UniProtKB/Swiss-Prot annotation:
This is Acyl carrier protein phosphodiesterase. Converts holo-ACP to apo-ACP by hydrolytic cleavage of the phosphopantetheine prosthetic group from ACP. The keyword tRNA-binding does not apply. It is an enzyme of class 3 (hydrolase). Coiled coil: none annotated. One of its GO terms (biological process) is fatty acid biosynthetic process. It holds the Pfam family ACP_PD. Belongs to the AcpH family. HAMAP family: AcpH. GO terms for molecular function: [acyl-carrier-protein] phosphodiesterase activity. InterPro entries: ACP_PD (IPR007431), ACP_phosphodiesterase_gpbac (IPR023491).
């Protein structure tokens, strides 16, 4: 899962959206640096990552990547799940339009920015102003996201080529998304993530 899915599942679970978004920027035990609700959001994010990576649908999808891109398949798939969530948002969350949800999420996350790591603050400067969460529905934007990550981290250069794996297996990936994401939503609503 990437930004949008973590925020959405956190909302469904009444967990800290701030902590769920911040989690990738925090190493070790967050309890000494953040309030309890943010800490619980960080831990929820970590649990979601482990659960998602071990889902049979996700493990199967990783196998569809070519040898030269399989190493970056988990990252590519996380971005792709956000694509499907953004694309199908009106079906998934008919009572909370995406633009309104993004505004709500932004307001929640903004409260922790003064005490956040600089890299997280930098991400937030772009995430909201450039409307990444809404633009995830556009596959051209997904390609730009993958290229951007490859540019920032040369060891992830294979992300550029992973676009072709997504394109080749688009329909099957979308089908897998519909298999597992509603289950994860139900787990979040039961606070079982």
């Amino acid at each position: 899962m990437n930004f949008l899915a973590h925020l959405h599942l956190a909302h469904l679970a009444d967990s800290s959206l701030s902590g769920n978004l911040l989690a990738d920027f925090v190493r070790g035990n967050p309890a000494t640096h953040y309030p309890p609700d943010v800490v619980e959001g960080i831990y929820m994010h970590r649990r979601i990552d482990v659960i998602t990576d071990n889902l049979p649908e996700v493990r199967e999808a990783r196998e569809w990547f070519r040898h030269e891109t399989r190493r970056v398949a988990p990252i590519t798939l996380d971005v792709m799940w956000d694509h499907f969530l953004s694309r199908h948002w009106t079906q998934i969350s008919p009572d909370f339009p995406l633009q309104a949800f993004v505004g709500y999420a932004h307001a929640q996350v903004a409260t922790i920015l003064p005490d956040s790591p600089p890299r997280f603050v930098n991400l937030n400067d772009y995430l909201w102003s450039e409307k990444w969460l809404e633009r995830y529905r556009d596959m051209d934007f997904i390609q730009n996201v993958l290229n951007g990550m490859a540019n920032r981290r040369p060891r992830l250069d294979a992300l550029r080529d992973s676009w072709y794996d997504l394109d080749a297996h688009y329909d099957a990936l979308e089908e897998r998304f519909w298999h597992f994401y509603p289950r994860m939503m139900a787990q979040a609503a039961r606070k079982a993530l």
